[in-house]
């Protein structure tokens, strides 16, 4: 007999955050989020509360053990932006048991019906700055710190409940060709930069770089990602939090921007050192031993995770894609490979760029959709 309880106590909050750590204990591919960041979402002043409402549920077996969890989100800003009537599900984790999944999703779906919304989609977090998508290919690969890992049986549990594909994301692993990028690409890049009087910013100091460009970068993220699936505008509070979180990970050599003659950014790429293994060993807790493991990975990583890449709108149709390739190559020059993280499968402009590198498409993630109030025939 499985019972479902809404998370209302501090004890349950800790159980909610702890459960995936227990479920994936010993798994070589799972990388947890930071434990403190997950607990923070229960605080009344959580950064997303100004644009979203949330509910959390736990599933217990007859012995009182946690066997599953799920979160529901009413992302008001997303519904307003896209003209939709949706809730999102996220942070679904469970043992391989149909009853557990059925009852967890039933709880979230009923919450959505009480709110009067028409659809449920997910896995999607509060924004695309959170982990999103259900892994359906690539279970043998280590997850990046930015993305979620899940067992392969999740797909069956979810699809058996009537959920259907809404969108897929693809992930690639890129390597720099021996000898660097093709000479023709380098010539095209140079011509492109000269034609529009563009150049790479060469500010050495990370502090000076952020002071000079951080506001531009956030504006460009909002602009260049505006039309992508499920995105919501960045609030000022969220920008402040993201900057605080990213300062731990950001290294100057993994941020590359192309600027015009007025020092305005026209294209950018941001990568994070791959820290999955270090976080994996700590269970997401930033202890002193964890920090000691992190430092070498931050300064001399084997892998760089591509976090963000974008072009200013007016330059998208000017053919500056060749100039973006050296930008990425610079980020990859000191590592074994780059993880692209999520690219929508129909984002051909981005995916075509990967053809100029050694590239394997090794992971696929899916966002599902289900009608909560289907029309009666």
Predicted stretch roles:
Residues 2-3:
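Extreme N-terminal starter segment of soluble prokaryotic enzymes
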Residues 148-229:
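Acyltransferase donor/substrate-recognition loop-hinge adjacent to the catalytic core
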Residues 66, 76-79, 128-130, 179, ...:
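Flexible loop/turn segments at secondary-structure boundaries
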Residues 356-367, 375:
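A structural motif corresponding to the C-terminal lobe/cap of the Radical SAM core domain
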Residues 80-162, 282-357:
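Acyl-donor binding region in acyl/amide transferases
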Residues 20-57, 61-62, 70-80, 203-204, ...:
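A conserved beta-strand-loop-helix scaffold within acyl/acetyltransferase catalytic domains
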């Amino acid at each position: 007999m499985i019972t479902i309880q809404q998370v209302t106590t501090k004890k349950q909050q800790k159980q909610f955050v702890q459960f995936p750590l227990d479920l994936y204990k010993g798994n070589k591919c799972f990388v947890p989020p930071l434990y403190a960041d997950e607990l923070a979402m229960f605080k009344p002043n959580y950064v997303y509360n100004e644009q979203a409402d949330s509910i959390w549920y736990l599933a217990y077996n007859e012995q009182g053990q946690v066997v599953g969890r799920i979160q529901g989100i009413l992302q008001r800003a997303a519904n307003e932006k896209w003209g939709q009537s949706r809730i999102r599900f996220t942070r679904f984790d469970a043992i391989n048991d149909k009853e557990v999944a059925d009852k967890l999703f039933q709880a979230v779906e009923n919450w959505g019906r009480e709110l009067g919304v028409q659809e449920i989609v997910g896995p999607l977090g509060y924004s695309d700055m959170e982990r999103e998508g259900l892994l359906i290919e690539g279970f043998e690969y280590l997850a990046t710190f930015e993305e979620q890992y899940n067992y392969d049986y999740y797909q069956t549990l979810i699809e058996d409940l009537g959920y259907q594909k809404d969108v897929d994301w693809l992930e690639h692993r890129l390597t720099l060709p021996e000898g660097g990028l093709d000479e023709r690409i380098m010539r095209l890049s140079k011509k492109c930069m000269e034609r529009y009087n563009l150049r790479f910013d060469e500010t050495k100091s990370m502090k000076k770089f952020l002071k000079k460009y951080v506001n531009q970068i956030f504006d460009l993220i909002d602009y260049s990602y505006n039309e992508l699936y499920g995105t919501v505008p960045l609030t000022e509070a969220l920008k402040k939090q993201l900057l605080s979180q990213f300062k731990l990970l950001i290294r100057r050599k993994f941020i590359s921007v192309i600027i015009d003659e007025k020092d305005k950014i026209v294209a950018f790429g941001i990568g994070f050192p791959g820290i999955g293994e270090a976080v994996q060993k700590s269970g997401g807790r930033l202890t002193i031993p964890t920090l000691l493991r992190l430092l070498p990975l931050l300064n001399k990583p084997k892998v760089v995770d591509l976090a963000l890449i974008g072009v200013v709108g007016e330059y998208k149709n000017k053919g500056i894609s060749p100039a973006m390739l050296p930008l990425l190559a610079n980020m990859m020059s000191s590592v074994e490979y780059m993880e692209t993280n999520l690219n929508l499968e129909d984002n051909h402009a981005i995916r075509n760029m990967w053809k100029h590198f050694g590239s394997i498409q090794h992971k696929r993630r899916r966002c599902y959709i289900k009608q909560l109030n289907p029309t009666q025939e």
